[in-house]
Every structure is written in structure tokens, then in C-alpha cells.
Amino acid sequence: MFQKRVVVIVGFIAIIFFVIIIRLFALQVINNSYYRIQARKYATRIELIADPRGKILDRNGNVLVTNRLAFDLFVTPALYFKSKSNKPKSSATLQVNPTATKEVDYFADQDSDQWEIIRRLANLMKVKTDDIASKMKTIQQKILSQSETKPERERKRFIKQQYRNRYKIFSGLTLAQAVQVESHPELFAGFNVAETISRNYIYNDLACHIIGYTGPIWKEEYDQFVENGYFDDMLNPEIDENTYQALIDMGGFKNAFLGRSGIEKIHNGLLTGRYGVRMSEFDFATKQKDELSRTESIPPTDIMLTIDLDLQKKLEAALKGKSAGAGIVIDVHTGEILAMASAPSFNPNLLQPPVDSQMTEFISKSPLKPLYNRAISGEYPPGSVFKMVTALAALEEGKITAYTPFYCNGHFSPQYKKFKCWIAEHNREHGSLSLEDAFKGSCNVYFYNAGKLAGGDAITRWARNMGFGERTGIDVSGEKKGRVPKLPVDNDALVASISGTNSANLKTSKSTWALSDTLNMSIGQGDLIVTPLQIVRMVAAIANGGTLVRPRIIKSNIHTPHPSSPLRGEEPGEGDNSLGGSAVLIPSAQAVTKVNISAGTLT
């Protein structure tokens, strides 16, 4: 009997050992590669290597935008939860019971060492403890939520891995705050500081609509960027697909900054360069990090603008305090923008981390629209400045000469009583006028007559020849194209040829064009809207004798650009470089130029 019991016990022990041996064999031989990969994943960190963003300078080399050293605060949850009296919570954080992961509150005990760390940090950062706890909870909940999609055997490992990653919770620490955290790891367990680069707009709001601003990647657009391959364009081409995918999986680009408007946006690729990658192993016991491999970054490009700093200052001073307005100074021969401003302005430094949420909301939602670049995005009826196009059309069509007279008694005709000259408001008249006199007095009646002779078709055609109704192609994002009316086929000629027709029968509609529409357009009113930049371009073409230049804001790239496409956003449009396919209009554009100079309207 005793011997039988011994045999049973020995057999039972043998079975246990056999099971253990089989399990060890499975771990060390069959699943060796799987666990080796997993172990390496948990111990390996992949980090982006980024160069400071390229500078932006004016045409004379004055630095407008550079970079300054900044500090970000990161937390490594695994190290944070290992602080002293948290062992019950530490083990709880790694539970994989599906019913428990959503219910455990690791911050309920405000007497724990974790809460003491949070209190110290809140005091240092001058924020509420709840603000930090909320950020920590968000990280924790996201990890637990993601773990639920993993197979049961991988969940615990996944949570451990994610807890060993670093997560940014604050940007824009002062040097004193950064030194305090780094100098006392025992007081701020799990938290560390990383140097980063923040944009520095030296002259605050100066040229803000040209330069634009940078900002973080929004949560709602991150997945879209991944899907469209934006981040692949931001890496050194030598970095392989596996490393890129690992970066995507770990959210390696979520802390990246990119251009949000202006030059910062349209030339984001040049200003950013291309990221490199550093792969290292981190020992959680010793907290030592050993570099395994490195692929260097590709340096960014500095960009020189065409604007002149002193001229820009003077233009912005003229617009200071205005609720709305725009101004542009252009080289009429080259198309270089020497100054461009829009009012009201904004300070892009206020949109850099740490971002004041109230200030951001004010800037983005203010009814004054300070982010709106009225110089290239504002669309308005051009008014009297469009009279130059009317004159050009009438001259080019051979309907008038510079000396053709029209008589202004204050009104166009008895049938069109509402079409009157501004001087009629003062019970006066201009009398007989030449083209030069008409420009001097900005006489509506003269241009009503010139427009009627030229016809709506000719005026709209020459408006398009002068660049209206299309983007100029300036190398800044956000340009609008305005609108030039489209005439029904043959309708204008028909209506304009009818003499003595009652104005009630000439009302415009979607399918008809009336003489009243031609009259309105002749003085820059009606269904015609343009941007300030289009007006400046038109005036430049008349001033230089007929060449329609393409406005540009980039003078040169200081460094040889690398073969990189910018992070795709809104690309500059294409603009024509000539009037109606011909670079010079002779003699009409020159005639209008001479008349305007003589009249004093182009001086």
C-alpha cells in the first residue's frame, strides 16, 4: 500500500516536471523568436531627431523668425507608479481582467505617494492638481482602452510596454522649472524634461499674415495624415518602412509641429527639413539608455522674403488700430512684394506653447478675424480703381481715345436716373471731360459712357486679361480668386444696341445682361469682386506699360533645398505672367499710364 502511494506521488511529480519542461521548451525553442521580438520591443525606444526649424529673413538679411530653446514635461507611467507606497495600485495597473480595467481608479487615494508627486508638480507648474491628474488619467484610460483590442495573452505585455513609453503632458516649461524637475528625480518620480525648440517671432505681429505661424498636430487630423502618408514625406529617405511603421504605431509624430498659415505652412517642408531617427535600449532598472543605431536628419532651409523690414514697419504703422484694412507695396517690374499687411493683426508668439487657451479662442473666434489675410483673401467690389480697366477696354477696342470728350451734368441719362456722378450730391457737374480730366475728378458719368461704348463683353474680357477672376499665384497660402461676371452669349450686344429702351425692361437676371450691369461694372460695382492683391497687380501692369507680373514673396532659399515636398496643405495657385497672352499692351496700357500719371492718380 505504501509502495503504491510512493509510485503515485513520484508519477505525479514526474508529470509536473514534464509539463514544466514542455513549457520551457515552448518558451525557449518554439516561441523563442516571438518573445525575443517582444522583449526587444519593450526595451527599445525609437525617437525622432529634428533640427531647429529654418529661419525666415527679410530681403536684406534681417532675421524675422528664428527659434528659441524650450522645455517639455514628459511622464513615464511605469516609473511614476513605482514610487513608494503604491504597490497595491502598481499591481492593479497591470491587471488584464476585462471587467476591472475600466473601473479601477488609480488616483482615488489622495494620501498616496503619487498624489504627493502631483502636488509638488502642480505647485511648481502653477496649475491645479486636478489638471495634472486629469492628464494622467487620460493617458491611463487610453492605454487600457487600446489593450482591449489585443488578444488575452498579449494584453498584459501591451500595457507594460505602453506604460514604459513617455507621454508629453506639458509644454513651455521655464528653465527654472526644467532644472527643478531634472535635479530632483526623487521628488518627481516618473517625470522628466526634454529640450525642444519653439518658434520665436522676433517682431511679434509684424508681417504675421505673410509669415504665418506654427502649431501642433490636432488629434482629429493625425489619422488623416497617417493615411495620406504625410509623415513619410517628413523622414530621411534612408529610414526603412519597418522603422516608419514603428514610429506610427507608437505615435511618434504626435508631438510634431507644422506650419499652419503663411510661409510657415506653404513651405513647411523646406523649413522643417527631414527627421532622422535614433534607436536606443532603455534599462528600467538602471535607467540607462544605450544608442543602438542612428539615421541623421536632413537640415532645413532658411528662407529669404522679398519684403523690406523698414517698409513693412511703416505700412503696418499706417494700419495700426484699424478694425479692417490691407496694404501692399509691390515692385511693378519684378512682382516682388516689398510690404504687405492686413489689419487687425495677431501675435504668432501667443500661439506657441504653452498656449493660452483663452487667447487662442479669442484670436480664432474674434469677429474682427485677426487671422484673416485681407490682402489676399478679402474679396470686395473694387470701386473707382476699376475705372482704369474700363478705360483700357474702351481704348483697346477703339471706342475712345485719350482725348475723347464726354459731358457730365451729374447724371448718365434721364432713363437711368440712379446712375449719377458723385458730384451731383453737391448739386454740381464736371462739364466736358477728357480721359485725363475724368481720372482727376473720378467722374462716374465719363466712365459710364466709356463702358457703354466698350460693352460689357469687352470690359469683362479685359478684366480677366488684367488678372481678375483668378489667383495671382503668390507663394502664400489662402489666396482667393474673386469673381468676374459672365455674360450670356450675344445678350450684351443686343441689349446695348437698343436705344431708348425703358430701364424696367433691362433688369439683370441669371440669364440676361442689361446695360445697367455694364454701367455698374464700369465704375467697379455690381457682380464684380476682387482682392487687394489683384488690384495692386493690375495697377502694376498699367504702371510698367503692360506686363502682368506674378507677385512673389520668396526671394531665395538660403541653403540648397533637399528633395522634399512640403507637408501638403494648400499649394500656391498658378498665375499668368502676361496680359491675354501678350506681355505688353501697346499703346493702350501705356496711354492709361500716362493719363493717370498726368492726372496724379499713379504718383
Task: List each model region and its residues.
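Solvent-exposed, polar/charged alpha-helical surfaces in well-ordered, non-transmembrane soluble domains
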Residues: 71, 115-119, 123, 171, ...
